[in-house]
Amino acid sequence: MVNGKYLVEKLIVYAKSFLYLAETDEIYMRNCLLASLRLSSPLSEVPNLDFIKEMSVPDVLFDEIKDYSRENAIASDDTQATLFAASVFGMLTQKPSEINTTFSYLKEKMGAQAACDYLYNLSVMNNYIQKTAISKNLLWEYRDGDNVLEITINLSKPEKDNKDIMKLAKAPVDGEKYPKCALCPENEGYLGSYTHPPRSNLRTVSLTLGGEDWSLQYSPYAYFNEHCIVFNKHHTPMRMTRQTITKLFDFIDILPNYFVGSNSDLPIVGGSILNHEHYQGGRHEMPMHKAKPRYTLTSEKFPDVEISILNWYNSAIRLTGYNKNTICELGGDIVDAWKAYSDESVGIINSAEERHNTCTPIARYLSDSKFCLEIILRNNITTEEYPDGVFHAHPEYHNIKKEGIGLIEAMGLYILPGRLKKQIEQIADILCGDAPFCPEKIEPTDPLYVHKKMITELKEVNPDLDDREKALEIIRKRINETCVHILENTAVFKTNETGTLAFRRFLNTLSIK
């Protein structure tokens, strides 16, 4: 049984140590905690709790709150217990006004990174960023010639199907739904429910991008270092326009220590949330950022901008220079031109009735004081042969990755579904002969059914395998190669001669040669 009075004192010490609880607020906060835990009085004598000050994450305390809520009929199940624990940490966390004031002060006095450190660490220590759960994700790098892919098996976020994402994008806004979606500003401090994750402990800071009101928060899933989400304060759909480029660079002006990018505004080639305009960024050098130019080009209209087609798997253009305004102008021209472009000789079909072309732009401030804009060209057309998308992961790779390839993965950081962790172990058992496998008898309901073809091929090539580590290495190699092929699938202009000529034809329409 959890001692509630003892728990209250531990939470007070924790909040004073990590969540900026002031001495003058200690009695007030203790009474708030007593009320929440349904206690009438605190401990008469407070024991030594210095060990609390050594904590690096709040997991133990969060779990104690959950246990206490179940033991004392405050919560009837795990979901309610989680919501309650998050609400307690929300109570312990500074109010949004205080957070914004401190963030602005630190940014002005100590710089952008100090301000970001403050908000990030607060979000870890109030359990919004669930650092322990994130640390369980599997992560490795794959070097492929001049390029490197970062591959993670995500154990904290469920896999989404493209068809579900399309339904969400087209769904009418329900006036009764509150908050309207997971990105709306009304999430800040929201208790949550059985269908909505707890957001009592969420804190954001306000930004102005393109003259509009936006907010910044950190991602609870944190796919990379200081992974942040930047969202419009109004519930408005994703859109890809010239103004998108301007807003990305407005963000870079505020936080030059981060990159920032926008998912595209169309299903299949966009992110999982299309009904609320948002960007993603953070303090991480993405694999695509390390890619070298394949070709260097020039613009007649913007001679001060360095232009290159990247030596990368998908169709990416890099613009760099010291003049942010000319980069924004040229970037806007590329976005507008691509949205209206067609070239049926390479399968790029676009029409006024149904637009298929869009972009994935990413802005950065480089160490040599140059501005950088990378634009990945995207197309979401479907056919009978490829009903999930011509420039999407082809069906033979869906056993590894079926979700749309959004901003993060298009830059070479793969987020693979958590189901793969167990399935890799099971496939290793089969390859080593420790588990039976008969492709003719495997049922569609079997989790390994989706891997039937891959397992058969791997067994044929490695018939007498008895080294488990070797088996795991073989499976991982297959996953690595699949990730490369998926990115190649997303390229609207393939890297062969035909694709390269087609790419340059498009750029010629902008007088880029």
Name each model feature, range by range:
Residues 1-237, 311-314, 328-331, 337-513:
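Active-site microenvironments that recognize anionic phosphate/pyrophosphate groups
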Residues 226-232, 270-286, 376:
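Histidine-centered divalent-metal-coordination microenvironment in nucleic-acid enzymes
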Residues 267-275, 353-358:
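Beta-rich nucleic-acid/ligand-interaction surfaces
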Residues 216, 260, 277-279:
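Hydrophobic faces of well-ordered beta-strands that scaffold small-molecule active sites
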Residues 211, 220-223, 227-265:
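Secondary-structure-rich domain cores
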Residues 243, 252, 256-272, 281-335, ...:
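Catalytic or ion-translocation cores adjacent to nucleophile or general acid/base/metal-coordination motifs
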